[in-house]
Amino acid sequence: YRRIAPGYEVYSKMGLYERRLDNFDERALIENTQVPGMCVNCHTSCKTNPDNYVFHIRGDHGGTLFKTGQKTEILKAKNDSIKGSMVYPYWHPSGKYCTFSTNMTRQGFHMVKDERVEVFDLSSDIFVYDVEKHELIVDTLLSTKLYSENSPVFSADGRTLYYITSLQQDYPLYYKDQKYNLCRIAFDPATGRYGEKA
């Protein structure tokens, strides 16, 4: 779990922790004091296995950390294939793949009562990362200019990738017009290939 003080405008000390349920012993996976001035996102484990997890470190020198067994790998936050950070992960049931959305997010704060904060995407695409081969699996069906693809999830059998998509709006002006479609695309776990249509 991620422990952070209440509020969302600023943060000071935060970290990702594991806790034993039998005796409540706690250990830090990482604290942001180890990466000064940066934010650590919630981590996602593969089928609740504490030895296999991923999380993203936000900031100028951020990256995405994969831990599989005894091996740790840090991926650059951006490269020529993806334009934003690797934000929302979801593991394939096999543990061989992890899907992400790559988002350029912004926050908008309201000036009226009972309206707190809106988080919106300036852009968002989806891809799958092959954990064993250390390769990005990208497709133009999941990376479009006019739409934001987001929140990818594998089906229980690992043969379908579900996600949401929406037409880009003029943010923050038209944030209330944001509507999402639920989509899916076939995924072959044996080859790491997507289907031909979404």
Question: What kind of region is each of these model predictions?
Answer:
Residues 1-11, 100-122, 163-179:
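Short, conserved, GDST-rich strand-edge loop motifs in beta-rich repeat architectures
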Residues 2-27, 192-194:
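Blade/loop signatures of beta-propeller domains
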Residues 13, 50, 58-61, 123, ...:
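Surface-exposed loop/turn positions within WD40 beta-propeller blades
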Residues 15-17, 63-65, 125-127, 181-183:
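A short loop-to-beta-strand structural motif that recurs across blades of beta-propeller domains
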Residues 21-38, 67-85, 128-148, 186-198:
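Multi-bladed beta-propeller domains
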Residues 35-38, 44-60, 83, 88-101, ...:
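Blade-terminus and WD-like Trp-Asp/Gly-His loop motifs, strongest in beta-propeller folds
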Residues 73-99, 117-120, 171-184:
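Long amphipathic alpha-helical scaffold regions
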Residues 87-88, 101-108, 127, 136-145, ...:
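Short, conserved micro-motifs composed of acidic
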